[in-house]
Swiss-Prot record:
Belongs to the PRA-PH family. It catalyses: 1-(5-phospho-beta-D-ribosyl)-ATP + H2O = 1-(5-phospho-beta-D-ribosyl)-5'-AMP + diphosphate + H(+). InterPro entries: HisE, PRib-ATP_PPHydrolase-like. PANTHER family: HISTIDINE BIOSYNTHESIS BIFUNCTIONAL PROTEIN, HISTIDINE BIOSYNTHESIS BIFUNCTIONAL PROTEIN HISIE. GO terms for cellular component: cytoplasm. It is found in: Cytoplasm. This is Phosphoribosyl-ATP pyrophosphatase. Keywords: Amino-acid biosynthesis, ATP-binding, Cytoplasm, Histidine biosynthesis, Hydrolase, Nucleotide-binding. Its main location: cytoplasm. Its EC number is 3.6.1.31. Pathway: Amino-acid biosynthesis; L-histidine biosynthesis; L-histidine from 5-phospho-alpha-D-ribose 1-diphosphate: step 2/9.
């Protein structure tokens, strides 16, 4: 991790480290202690805020809300025990075919 850039892999490591901290000192730990439903709720809120910022004209707001969204996604993935490499593998699988083929191949629920 460089001082001016944090990758998603860095964020995954930061969340994992902060998950081990005391809840009084770590927002990440306190969020995880509230359970998966709260983590999912926060992710949803940040997704909406990002979408709303995107329809506005303030690029800085989009950047800020996207950072919040990515953080809350990293927390949710950690809470579910999903590693970023697993998401990368799924993205690789999907990019081996066209978007229409990939969508058609998903199981309907």
């Amino acid at each position: 991790m460089s001082e001016d850039r944090v990758t998603l892999a860095d964020l995954e490591r930061i969340v994992a480290a902060r998950a081990q901290a005391d809840a009084g000192a770590s927002y990440t730990r306190s969020l995880l202690d509230k359970g998966i439903s709260k983590c999912a709720q926060k992710l949803g809120e940040e997704a909406v805020e990002t979408a709303l910022a995107a329809v506005g004209s303030d690029k800085a707001a989009v950047i800020s809300e996207t950072a919040d969204l990515l953080y809350h996604l990293a927390v949710l993935l950690h809470a579910k025990g999903v590693e970023l490499d697993e998401v990368h593998a799924e993205l690789a699988r999907r990019t081996r075919q066209s978007g229409h083929e990939e969508k058609a191949s998903r199981q309907r629920s």
